[in-house]
Amino acid sequence: MRNIKFFDTTLRDGEQSAGVNLNLQEKLEIARQLERLRVDIIEAGFPASSKGDFEAVKQIAETVRTCSVTGLSRSVRSDIDAAWEALKGGAEPRLHLFIATSPIHMVHKLRMTPEQVIEAAVEAVKYAKRFFPIVQWSAEDACRSELPFLAKIVAEVIKAGASVINIPDTVGYITPKEYGEIFLYLQNNVQNIENVSLSAHCHDDLGMAVVNSLSAIEHGATQVECTINGIGERAGNAALEEIAVALHIRKDYYQVETRLNLQEIKRTSNLVSKLTGVVVPPNKAVVGKNAFAHESGIHQDGVLKEKTTYEIISPELVGVPSNSMVLGKNSGRHALRYRVEELGYTLSDEEINQLFVRFKELADKKKDITDDDLIALIFEEKFDHFKDFYQLSSIQVQYGTNQIPTAVVVLKYGKGNEIQEAATGSGSVYALYNTLERCFQTEVTLLDYRIESVGGGRDALAQVFVKVRVRDVETSGRGTAQDVLEASAKAYINAMNRVFMIEAMRAENEKVATS
């Protein structure tokens, strides 16, 4: 059977989703989880784009040992140099070069002739091969390119040393039949193409990213580029979990193998969703909350008698736990650590100790601590204090049917400094956010506000996700608490801390650029 390699671009293309801004710690955690999932290649970022991206790619390359780490690069020497400096410490450094090949891109964006584009691509591949043992070359907007020109430039970059040829559907335009025909055309019209790997990269603008990727595999592709949960700019990218499970369940049809550890899929999906703030729809294939739910009486009866009547994917295949341990106030540190590890999370002794304190605080208020509660606590403890410019000290919100909602907030910042503000609003959350805006003394546009319960019951934790815009920065935040208003405040403060972190990084980049 052919082996299909999975090239994960969650940390590069996926992070281009509107409002998604991952910090270094979060990127490293996702990279470690992708390694546990056993993807073949992790595209960690675009090293030349910023100092922050460079550092993230460098640290991921030095951390990940069992899969290849790559970075994106334009066809210019300065980008290639930056990528090598970031990636040279990796276990298997490789470069992902690209240049546009469609008439619309060459004329309006690059302002280059086809001959100039070929020359730039060939020169970039030759230069990159001085450093990188593996060079992947991508024809941006390949699916709107003229096929004879596409074949010509692919032949030239193969001669120059490219070992992987990627054919991206950059704008999600192509149909499955047409996409497969492009791969066949190249195999029939490009000399020595049998000596390289063909790769697919599909966007979901017309809802066909996954089926296009599968069509490419049917027609000769041996690598597929995708993201966890299908996140990405505009309508997103092909969803890794859907392609992977389709290839597994229908191995009889596709006749291919992968090295993926499918039992890590659900955990990876949860991690990416929590850290990016991009919620997985309940009806999402493979990883949605309802993916294994049966409401129809006929379906329920069938599944109880024989699971395969209506269930083609077992929850256990993708890592949905079949058992749920309930912890309580009498549970000790050992039981907590055991369940954390059972759920697939790795925490240091210090992190376990901090988590145990939060666990005990919650157990005093809530009789049973479920897996969902525990995961929420892990995320809050491990990721939500990455760079706390401001911390919530206290909130007080007054609300009554015939009263104007009023909020009082105290924030801590720096070394022992405090801010206290009060404001009103037409509702409790409105009053709370007006007060926080006063604390930060800047105009904040709230783009999205979502709340969901963690588990069920009256004492369930509340989890709030917000998306904000401050000046030209758009980012998200999250907060968890038993009280809805406290969770709302934490989410807003978390988002603002991200804003200040991004602005500080930009200022540092500008300082480096002018020095």
Curated annotation (Swiss-Prot):
Alphabetical keyword list: Amino-acid biosynthesis, Branched-chain amino acid biosynthesis, Cytoplasm, Leucine biosynthesis, Manganese, Metal-binding, Transferase
Positions of the Pyruvate carboxyltransferase domain: 4-266
Organism superkingdom: Bacteria
Residue numbers binding Mn(2+): 13, 201, 203, 237
Region (Regulatory domain) residue spans: 391-515
Catalysed transformations (reactions): 3-methyl-2-oxobutanoate + acetyl-CoA + H2O = (2S)-2-isopropylmalate + CoA + H(+)
Pathway: Amino-acid biosynthesis; L-leucine biosynthesis; L-leucine from 3-methyl-2-oxobutanoate: step 1/4
GO cellular component, one term: cytoplasm
A Pfam family the protein falls into: LeuA_dimer
Cofactor: Mn(2+)
GO biological process: L-leucine biosynthetic process
InterPro entries: 2-IPM_HCS-like, 2-isopropylmalate_synth_dimer, AIPM/Hcit_synth_CS, Aldolase_TIM, LeuA/HCS_post-cat, LeuA_allosteric_dom_sf, LeuA_bact_synth, PYR_CT
Record's function text: Catalyzes the condensation of the acetyl group of acetyl-CoA with 3-methyl-2-oxobutanoate (2-ketoisovalerate) to form 3-carboxy-3-hydroxy-4-methylpentanoate (2-isopropylmalate).
HAMAP family, per database record: LeuA_type1
Summary of subunit composition and partner proteins: Homodimer.
Name of protein: 2-isopropylmalate synthase
Species assigned in the record: Geobacillus stearothermophilus
Gene coding for it: leuA
